[in-house]
Structure formats: C-alpha cells, structure tokens
Amino acid sequence: MSQISEHSEFCNISPPLTAQSAAGGQGCERLAFPAEVCYNGCKKNVRRDVVLIAITNASLPSKKRILTVCVKLFLEQGYKKTTVVQQSSVSNSIFQNIFRAKDGVLAELVEFMFSNQFATARSMAGAQLPPAYVYAVETAIQMTLTELNENLREIYIEAYTQKEASDYIFRETAKELYQIFGSYQPELTAQDFFFMELGSAGIMRAYMAHPCDEELTLEKKLQMFLTMSLRSYHVPEDEIQKIIAFIGGMDIRTVSERVMHELFKALAMRFEFTL
C-alpha cells in the first residue's frame, strides 16, 4: 500500500487496470496503471474515460451503500453532522475513489432533489400557469421548505455553496430562466441568463440562510425576493404585482408541506431507505 499512497486516491482501484488493458496511452512508471489513472505527477496522456469507467464498474455496490446511508442522514440530522465514511461502512479510500469528499454525495443528491422538487411544485400548483408564475411558485416553495425543515435549510445552503452542486444548480436554473424570461429580454443570450442566475442565486441563498422572524415574516421574505428577481428579468411592474398577489393567495405552507412529503418519499424510493 505504500506504493499506492504515493499516488492520488484514484489509483486505489480494484481490480487494477494495466497499461495493456487500456486502449492507447503509456503506463505509469510507478504502477501497472495507465497514466490516465494517475493524477499525482504522471505526465503521460490523459484519458479520463478510463478513470470513470474503472471507478463506476468496481464501485457500484459501495456507491449505492454510501448514497443510501448518507442521503438518509442528511435528511435526519443535517449535512454538517453526517460523518460519511463511518456511517456507510466503507473504507476512506473507497469513498474517496467514488466521491472524493462529502460534497460529492451532496451533488448526487442535489441533482435528483431539484428535478423532483420542481416537477412536484408544478403539479401542486394545479392549473396551467404562465411561465413567470411557475417560476414564482417554484422559488416560493423552495424558500418555504427551508423554513419548515432546518435540515433542508442546511442542505440547500450547502448546495448553493459547494462548487459541484452549485454549478449544477446555476447551469440548470439558467436554462429554465432563459425559457421563462427570454421573451422579456430577447436581446439576451442563454449565457447572459447564466450570468444573471449567479446573482439571483446569491439572493436566494441569502434569504434561505436567514430564518424568518417576527419582522422578516415568510410573506415578507417571498415578496422581497420575487420583487427583486422579477424586476431583474424585466417583468413589467403590473405583472409583478399580480404574481406576488397570486403567491400571497396560496396557502404556501400547506403546499410546501405536501411538496416536502412527496420529495422525501421520492428520495426514499430513489436511494432505498426509510425515514
């Protein structure tokens, strides 16, 4: 193992690849691995597909076990309190081969959670709504979820902070923003909306991180967020007021509780655990 420790964690793959088994590229001088597997000083050709295939095929059972345990614990006790390796009964090297760090698990969770959350939010909203209203419903529900459950608040804040998870959020949200608000600013490109999402995501994160109190009620928080975000996307002022009135007329807490229940159920099915 002393030889392996000189390399990055990606070298600790079983069964090992050999230079002959990898198509193309020269082998690492210190181990019988293709140079592509070594990220710690080897300067041969880089074929990242070899690394990804090796990790996936060798580690699927461990990956499933890690996700099952960790997603459950994230929901039950929060992101920060969860000790991944100890709870999932895998070695540190196996965990690092698959996820590198705890934020890798978070990224897997976020990708599934966001897609299901928004799909559920749309169905809960009921009638066919104009796109700007759908955006308001989705963001209002997300913000309300963080007021209903402190562990969800922590997950969302970390998701908007950690690079891998936040990159996914920014990228996917920007696509949705372009579809929803592109007609309000037809001169803007998809890339422009990505840059705008960086700002609106910062506003979202700040509001999620600040719990409601007697002065900053949930209703006030939603009104402030929607006013700023919709104005930034050039939604006309009279339409903004109608959207805010629509959200104000919803029982947003009850709707969000239903979304949270459906989200937890979907997560339990996807990652095979019970809460």
Residues of each region from the PLM?
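Basic, helix-initiating cap at the start of DNA-binding domains
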Residues: 32, 38-77
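Helical hydrophobic small-molecule/effector-binding pocket
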Residues: 132-157, 162-171
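Amphipathic alpha-helical packing segments from all-alpha helical-bundle domains
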Residues: 158-209, 216, 220-227
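C-terminal peripheral helix-coil segments that are non-catalytic and often amphipathic
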Residues: 32, 36-50, 179, 183, ...
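Charged/polar low-complexity intrinsically disordered segments
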Residues: 3, 9, 26, 36, ...
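Short, positively charged and aromatic/hydrophobic N-terminal segments
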Residues: 12-13, 39
